[in-house]
Curated annotation (Swiss-Prot):
Catalytic-site annotation from UniProt: 460
Membrane-spanning ranges: 22-42, 139-159
Name of the encoding gene: ftsH
One record GO biological process: protein catabolic process
EC number of the protein: 3.4.24.-
Co-factor binding comment: Binds 1 zinc ion per subunit.
Native source species: Parabacteroides distasonis (strain ATCC 8503 / DSM 20701 / CIP 104284 / JCM 5825 / NCTC 11152)
Regions of this protein lying in the Periplasmic compartment: 43-138
Pfam family, one: FtsH_ext
Chain residues that bind Zn(2+): 459, 463, 534
EC class name: hydrolase
Protein name: ATP-dependent zinc metalloprotease FtsH
NCBIfam families: FtsH_fam
PROSITE patterns (alphabetical): AAA (PS00674)
SUPFAM superfamilies referenced in this protein's UniProt entry, alphabetically: FtsH protease domain-like, P-loop containing nucleoside triphosphate hydrolases
Length: 684
């Protein structure tokens, strides 16, 4: 039965004869034949055949320097002495005679030659050297003559094979530099990643699963007039699972899957990128229907005319133009689906993003609480854990973590448990792994003085105090004065995963961040460089409030952000006067929050001092210790609110499910109740 969907029918083979295609192995064979012919038809200039009588006469005149007698061939090879060539060759041109001219003589036998030579030595006192050999080995002579050349050719072939080994284009060496480097996965490949291995990303998985479903069952969509998307672009931060999603597509789709990186198109040779694009789509058309996955497409898809090097004829632009033509030009790419991934969609060329090339943009964002729980469930499968490990608890402790970060946490926890000689990975190991990733390696060996420890303790206690007393500050988890990474102390928070952020929330976060510097000034009467990172974060946040969010009193409702990313920092969308006003507003916002931080710390001086002393004594404190000093927080965090709403929803779903189960059970009981006729054995 003929397939309804013509786009999935492979192109029929043309009746035209195939064009002649050059094979590099033919060149190797041609060189070998030429060498053999050169050896067999060796130029005889500089050599001469003599008769036995003439040879005897010349030998007695001491014309020859040395002779070689081949016993089996009854042949003598004699080399003429310098200055004696005229006696042998007459008036022949010197250039044809050569440097060491030779003569060849057919002798009656080796014994007769020996008799002649002995007599000539006795009578004429000749000094010619004579050597006897069994015979002339043609193969050996050939190897001696052309062995070095053959060796060079062999080395050259080996190097060319090595150079072309990574291109996937077979032999050809530098001649295959324009071939695509795509890796091909088909049904014969051993694939391990499926959609079951991709936790979270429900919406993104649905989009790509639809593409796979279309490839498996195209009639379901084509009967309604639908067409498969020509391309899908996966967009999202690093580590969120874009490439993993593509691997799952390769594992699920029963069609060939080409995979390569955007940088594979770029080469030092001009024109190679465009050639590789053409070759990639040629291979894809031959195996259609198929999927082509281009990872990090921003390496080749950057917007034209906006390159930082200001090169008007950039090689990358030529490659992009060819890619645009192949994706949706006059040629037909029926059955070839393009899947690409990038974390810089803002710099991609607009022509690349339009419908007809990438019909779908699938946003792969950082996982939320439920998605992190699912991701932990996947990565905890191969790890031996005890009953203390709870995926939901770990998900709450890792806000803002990507899928790659969560995989790293699980691996670090297993390594920490193995380092400590444990048989199972415990909750404590996971918490240490989170601390290791967020704060860096713990450095208890770093020596600090008593004055430095006091300064660090007051600094961290200032952060903890303000984060506890401010409504919109991130909830505190842990504070330590043990050096980690580059920091001498650190505080861990559970960032609120907000969908929108208000001015008050930003101000509370800035105030809590400035709490360390404010505590140093209030308690110690001096400030240190320990707050440099805090000041950097606060400055960026205040600048964003003024320039991007329009939260300034003197510059309200204005946004100076260029979302296209094409200005390259060469221009500013505001005047010098406005720039000065921006600096003034940023300074004003920071000063207000710094004064606010000092005021709150002054009002809670006793609690701050107790917290700093506990830090000095124990080095590490948790939210329970802060709660013991300041009391329970008066506000509920957004994460806790979401958890409570989710628990209520789960409770309602469970209650509804129980009611449905009871109703089904009641219906079954009514249906199965026997009638009076059935009881007496009659047919109802």
């Amino acid at each position: 039965m003929e397939n309804k969907n013509d786009m999935f029918n492979k192109t029929p083979k043309s009746g035209k004869p195939k064009m002649f295609r050059f094979n590099l192995y033919w060149m190797y064979g041609l060189i070998f034949i030429m060498l053999v012919a050169l050896y067999m038809t060796n130029d005889s200039s500089g050599t001469k055949e003599l008769g036995w009588t003439e040879f005897q006469k010349l030998a007695q005149e001491n014309v020859f320097d040395k002779m070689t007698v081949y016993n089996k061939k009854n042949l003598v090879e004699a080399t003429v002495k310098n200055g004696k060539t005229e006696q042998v060759f007459g008036n022949m041109d010197v250039s044809k005679i050569g440097v060491s001219p030779k003569v060849y003589v057919k002798i009656p036998s080796a014994d007769k030659f020996s008799d002649f030579y002995d007599k000539a030595v006795a009578d004429s006192h000749i000094d010619t050297q004579v050597r006897f050999e069994e015979g002339d080995d043609a193969i050996w002579n050939f190897l001696v003559s052309f062995g070095p050349i053959i060796l060079l050719i062999g080395v050259w072939m080996f190097l060319m094979r090595r150079m072309s080994g990574g291109t996937g284009a077979g032999p050809g060496g530098v001649f295959s530099v324009g071939k695509a480097k795509a890796q091909l996965f088909d049904k014969d490949n051993d694939r391990k990643v499926t959609f079951k291995d991709v936790a979270g990303l429900a919406e993104a998985k649905q989009e790509v699963e639809e593409i796979v479903s279309f490839l498996k069952n195209p009639e379901k969509y084509t009967e309604l007039g639908g067409k498969i998307p020509k391309g899908a672009l996966l967009v999202g931060p690093p580590g969120t699972g874009k490439t993993l999603l593509a691997k799952a597509v390769a594992g699920e789709a029963n069609v060939p899957f080409f995979s390569l990186s955007g940088s594979d198109f770029v080469e030092m040779f001009v024109g190679v990128g465009a050639s590789r694009v053409r070759d990639l789509f040629r291979q894809a058309k031959e195996k259609s229907p198929c999927i082509v996955f281009i990872d990090e497409i921003d390496a080749v898809g950057r917007a034209r005319g906006k390159n930082a090097n200001m090169n008007s004829n950039d090689e990358r632009e030529n490659t992009l133009n060819q890619l645009l033509t192949e994706m949706d030009g006059f040629g037909s790419n029926s059955g070839v689906i393009i899947l690409a991934a990038t974390n810089r969609a803002d710099i991609l060329d607009k022509a690349l993003l339009r419908a007809g090339r990438f019909d779908r943009q699938i946003h792969v964002e950082l996982p939320d609480l439920n998605e992190r729980k699912e991701i932990f469930g996947v990565h905890l499968r191969p790890i031996k854990i005890d009953e203390s490990v709870d995926a939901e608890f770990l998900a709450r402790q890792t806000p803002g973590f990507s899928g790659a970060d969560i995989a790293n946490v699980c691996n670090e926890a297993a390594l920490i448990a193995a380092r400590n000689g444990k048989k199972f990975v415990q909750k404590e190991d996971f918490m240490n792994a989170v601390d290791r990733i967020v704060g860096g390696l713990e450095k208890r060996s770093k020596i600090t003085t008593e004055e430095e420890r006091k300064c660090i303790a007051n600094h961290e206690a200032g952060h903890a105090t303000l984060s506890w007393l401010l409504e919109h500050a991130n909830p505190l988890v842990k504070v330590t004065i043990v050096p980690r990474g580059k920091a001498l102390g650190a505080a861990w928070y559970l960032p609120e995963e907000r969908q929108i952020t208000t001015r008050e929330q930003l101000q509370d976060e800035m105030c809590a961040t400035l709490g360390g510097r404010a505590a140093e000034e209030l308690v110690l009467g001096k400030i240190s460089t320990g707050a440099s990172n805090d000041l950097e974060r606060v400055t960026k946040q205040a600048y964003a409030m003024v320039v991007y969010f329009g939260m300034s009193d003197k510059l309200p409702n204005l946004n100076y952000y260029d979302s296209t990313g094409q200005d390259w920092g060469f221009t500013k969308p505001y005047s010098e006067e406005t720039a000065k006003l921006i600096d003034t507003e940023v300074q004003k916002i920071i000063n207000e929050q710094y004064d606010r931080a000092k005021r709150i710390l002054s009002e809670n001086k006793e609690g701050h001092s107790k917290l700093a002393q506990v830090l000095l004594d124990r080095e590490v404190i948790y939210s329970e210790d802060v709660e013991h000093i300041f009391g329970k927080r008066a506000w509920i965090s957004r994460s806790q609110e979401i958890l409570e709403l989710q628990e209520k929803a789960n409770g309602k779903n469970k209650e509804n499910a129980d009611k449905e189960a009871e109703a089904d059970a009641t219906t079954e009981n009514v249906t199965d109740t026997p009638t009076e006729e059935n009881k007496t054995g009659k047919i109802a």
